Amino acid sequence: MNYSVIKKCDIADGPGVRVTLFVSGCTHHCMGCFQPETWNFSFGKLFDESVEQELLDCLNPDYIRGLTLLGGEPFEPENQRVLFPFLKKVREACPKKDIWCYSGYLWDELTGKETGSGRARCEVTDEMLSLIDVLVDGEFVLEQKNISLKFRGSENQRLIDLRKSEEQGEIVLWDE
């Protein structure tokens, strides 16, 4: 997997001060995407163990609230297979930090609850979802763009609290 950039002090992609990883590779190709260069799976630099360690080190300070994944598309199967073991390391090394993930896929598609879904599902999808606290789901829709929304770009996108959703068996929206 490649990545395009790491932001070590981000306040736009989740609550508090965050470390943000922009992965490369996306098949959604949303009109108006703010990172179209990340559609290419080969764009950027190789995500390797040294990058993992750099991110873990960046997450250590107390003022960092958590990690955010976006891109590109973190839930493209080839990206999941790299991100899942990394997220396990994040949970082990930084158990008090939260993890947010932006995806153009809907929660129902990722969980397999939508009939005919499965394009993004692979052998690690469920386990990867279990490591994420908040999923911002849905493609960016230019016609629904709203710059006043908190932590999302278009009206159709949802901030889903995955922990509470799992507990209650239905989608529970995040509310800080």
Task: List the model feature ranges, each with a label.
Residues 96, 131-132, 156:
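A generic structural signal for alpha->beta connector loops
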Residues 1-3, 17, 35-115:
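Conserved Radical SAM active-site core
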Residues 53, 60, 114-144:
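Structural recognition of alpha->loop->beta junctions
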Residues 88-91, 100, 145-176:
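P-loop/Walker A phosphate-binding loop and immediately adjacent motor/lid segment at beta-alpha junctions
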